[in-house]
């Protein structure tokens, strides 16, 4: 029984219980979240729902999304408080490939594939890093 709130706990050796229920220490939390359109990949936003608004059973309050998806984009997003893992996944020096699937309204041409391979100028200081564009399936209007 701890009488002082500042009592230190050894997470490897001590057992902590509250109202008779054992509380297990979790250093990191991991959520694989299917981000809906209209939601921003941020920890807080005064205008839009954030991915964090959907995580209601978190143990830690230091969770963050690993990477981002645009507001109109849907897809899987990792949410964690594991900074080392985030660095391993996001650091350009680690060369972790990312895969995106998109439904395109219009035709994708060979020139588009080449532009992706060379990097695309999106109006920032430098063009995007080279990427592989693969056409998996085409949709036809009937």
Residue ranges and their predicted role:
Residues 1-142:
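Basic, flexible Lys/Arg- and Gly-enriched helix-loop patches that mediate nucleic-acid binding at interfaces
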